Amino acid sequence: MVWQRQHVLGLADFTPEEYQMVLQTSASFQEVLTRRLPKVPTLQGKVVVTLFFEPSTRTRSSFELAAKRLSADVLNFSPGTSSLSKGETLLDTARTFLAMGSDLLIVRHAQAGVPQQLAAEIDRRGSPVGVLNAGDGLHEHPTQGLLDLFTLCSHLDPRRPRLELLQGIKIAIVGDILHSRVARSDIYALVAAGAEVHLAGPPTLLPKDFAHFVPGHTLPVHWQLEPALEGARFVITLRLQQERMGEFLLPSLQEYHHFFGLTRQRLRLCHPDVKLLHPGPVNRGVELSSEVMEDPGLNLIEQQVTHGVAVRMALLYLMGGGRIPA
């Protein structure tokens, strides 16, 4: 099988075959990461540039480590110390890196659509350079959606994670869905896998029209937590993004936790083997109680971090021209 997609800008148009290629390749790199020397020369000589116009430690570090594990040369762009502060446009900055011989651009921006703009400019120039969206505004965060998918499938079958494992499985996504690009990518991936996706959150953070977020599908929307949790096999809880919120969307963090915080008592409504995911960073005592957060038998948060490196290795490898066995 050969990867055909030059840019990964979102999951809205991902095919089942593409999801499966990412899962299969991620599983291979997850094995690489367990070796004494967790490094392979597959992208040796390639130049990967991280263009992060929005603060990030976890995602940027994960991408940088993934690229280095593939033996790529990594350039980290910092807008505060760049020519952008002197008036250079974003496109001019990107053109500079293209002229330097970059092979892959990893882009994170607070404004939705910026990675698409860069990809359009690259396509206009006929360049083979790929753009990988590391999160853009309220649009999408495709690598988080893919690593969450890989984490879920790997939990159900560590040796052969695959899309169909989630068919008919109830998964609740809880929290600030309105401001979450992670939620949007997760929804696309989980619906593609055939999961039964339920959305839960306060009315101010979960508009009713999210029920029709994926064309051709109707997602249950709950403004109370309990119906979403009943029988759920997995629960993905989201960070309250206070930096993106206007005033008056929430009375207080304490009230949010009272109605939507995940506690051990509330989780008794779920499947007996329920597992929790969270994209991080976690607001302890808000989205999750400290008791739940500290229980490694209950949450898959550390696995998400580990799997994030493997999934990003897989995407960089595939976009860099790598193949997987048929």
From Swiss-Prot:
Enzyme Commission number, as recorded: 2.1.3.2
Molecular function in Gene Ontology: amino acid binding; aspartate carbamoyltransferase activity
Pathway involvement of the protein, from the record: Pyrimidine metabolism; UMP biosynthesis via de novo pathway; (S)-dihydroorotate from bicarbonate: step 2/3
Binding site for L-aspartate: 86, 181, 239
This protein's UniProt keywords: Pyrimidine biosynthesis, Transferase
UniProt-annotated binding residues for carbamoyl phosphate: 58-59, 108, 141, 144, 280-281
Disulfide bond in keyword set: no
Pfam families: OTCace, OTCace_N
GO cellular component, as recorded: cytosol
Domain of life: Bacteria
GO biological process: 'de novo' pyrimidine nucleobase biosynthetic process; 'de novo' UMP biosynthetic process; amino acid metabolic process
Reactions that this protein is recorded to catalyse: carbamoyl phosphate + L-aspartate = N-carbamoyl-L-aspartate + phosphate + H(+)
Family according to the record: Belongs to the aspartate/ornithine carbamoyltransferase superfamily. ATCase family.
Subunit structure: Heterododecamer (2C3:3R2) of six catalytic PyrB chains organized as two trimers (C3), and six regulatory PyrI chains organized as three dimers (R2).
PANTHER family: ASPARTATE CARBAMOYLTRANSFERASE (PTHR45753:SF6), ORNITHINE CARBAMOYLTRANSFERASE, MITOCHONDRIAL (PTHR45753)
HAMAP family: Asp_carb_tr
Function text: Catalyzes the condensation of carbamoyl phosphate and aspartate to form carbamoyl aspartate and inorganic phosphate, the committed step in the de novo pyrimidine nucleotide biosynthesis pathway.
UniProt-recorded name of the protein: Aspartate carbamoyltransferase catalytic subunit
Native organism: Synechococcus sp. (strain JA-3-3Ab)
Species lineage: Bacteria, Bacillati, Cyanobacteriota, Cyanophyceae, Synechococcales
